[in-house]
């Protein structure tokens, strides 16, 4: 309660009610509940001191990087070291509100036709590349036209690159066999099915999350073989099968999607980075053996940390001499609609942070 009211009264030029009114209401609310009644005086004292010393206290916080950027110190230090030219923009983007971006199901409707549907309802939206449409103002997804009919999914513009990247160059093959490892909740699985004709296995270690994949596919009118299993143990689910294309959206720190999951920066510990990098490396090694010669593997994470991106790619190429690195975006830093964007078609310049590396297996 104390933190909530402090946030409300922090900026005296941007509050809807008189600050003292908000303080009084907070104190009365604390008194009204047995579990907070004894803290009412403490809450009152803290808030009133803040109002008396607002300028000085805010000045103090501006001198502390953790308070200024709302990130833990180790995270700030890592971003500074890895992105010395643009670390401020990365941290600032994490503190912005993420847009509501849709991916149109092209098996059901075109982007142009869906924009017309939104226009009829006075919903302001724009095309942002590929099958992506961004709403100017977020609203309930189920209230949008065509949700129950499977016309669209919610997916960030950067995440929408995965399926086209993987399928480019292999779509022409007949009897195409594709694996989506670590597939839940199913957004990329669905996108793969929307843009190609393939026999697809969607794999995830979590049975409950696999149910979400099935629900997603059912709403969109798509089908895949959904399996519960550990991608690191293919002997339990693979049945000796090899794949023409593999998408490994690996477990990661989620350091690229902080604006969608603000708590992740405080839940993560610095020690998580090498631990997750080890898991990513193991998954890459195991799944590489399940790729046919000439096949493609797309490695992706929603992370901006180099250990989970370029560092992983360099180590993989050094270990697997039959791996050839293909053209892919690499690190996409989170962007909040300002300046240049590494997504050429994304006119909004508003997307999460991601990493993509595309490998093909040499046939020699």
For each feature predicted by the language model, list its residue ranges:
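S-adenosylmethionine
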Residues: 1-364
């Amino acid at each position: 309660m104390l933190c909530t009211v402090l946030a409300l009264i922090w900026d005296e030029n941007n509050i809807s009610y008189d600050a003292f009114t908000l303080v009084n209401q907070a104190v009365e609310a604390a008194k009204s509940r047995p579990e907070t009644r004894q803290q009412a005086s403490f809450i009152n004292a803290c808030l009133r001191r803040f109002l008396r010393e607002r300028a000085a206290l805010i000045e103090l916080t501006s001198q502390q990087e953790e308070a200024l950027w709302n990130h833990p110190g180790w995270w700030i230090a890592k971003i500074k070291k890895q992105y010395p030219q643009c670390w401020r923009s990365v941290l600032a983007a994490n503190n912005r509100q993420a847009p509501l971006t849709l991916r149109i199901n092209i098996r059901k409707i075109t982007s142009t036709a869906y924009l017309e549907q939104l226009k009829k309802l006075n919903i302001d939206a724009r095309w942002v590349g590929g099958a992506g449409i961004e709403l100017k103002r977020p609203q309930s997804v189920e209230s949008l036209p065509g949700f129950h009919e499977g016309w669209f999914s919610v997916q960030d513009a950067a995440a929408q690159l995965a399926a086209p990247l993987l399928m480019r160059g292999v779509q022409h093959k007949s009897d195409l066999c594709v694996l989506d490892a670590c597939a839940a909740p199913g957004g990329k699985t669905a996108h793969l099915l929307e843009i190609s004709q393939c026999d697809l296995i969607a794999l995830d270690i979590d049975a409950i999350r696999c149910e979400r994949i099935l629900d997603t596919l059912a709403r969109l009118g798509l089908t895949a073989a959904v399996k519960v299993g550990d991608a690191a143990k293919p002997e339990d689910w693979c049945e000796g099968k090899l794949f023409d294309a593999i998408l490994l959206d690996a477990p990661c720190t989620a350091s690229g999607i902080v604006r969608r999951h603000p708590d992740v920066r405080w839940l993560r510990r610095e020690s998580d980075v090498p631990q997750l990098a080890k898991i990513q490396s193991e998954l890459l090694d195991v799944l590489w053996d399940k790729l046919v010669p000439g096949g493609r593997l797309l490695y992706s994470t929603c992370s901006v940390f180099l250990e989970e991106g370029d560092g992983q790619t360099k180590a993989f190429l050094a270990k697997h001499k039959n791996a050839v690195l293909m053209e892919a975006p690499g690190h996409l830093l989170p962007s909040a609609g300002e300046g240049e964007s590494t997504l050429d078609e994304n006119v909004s310049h508003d997307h999460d942070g991601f990493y993509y590396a595309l490998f093909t297996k040499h046939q020699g």
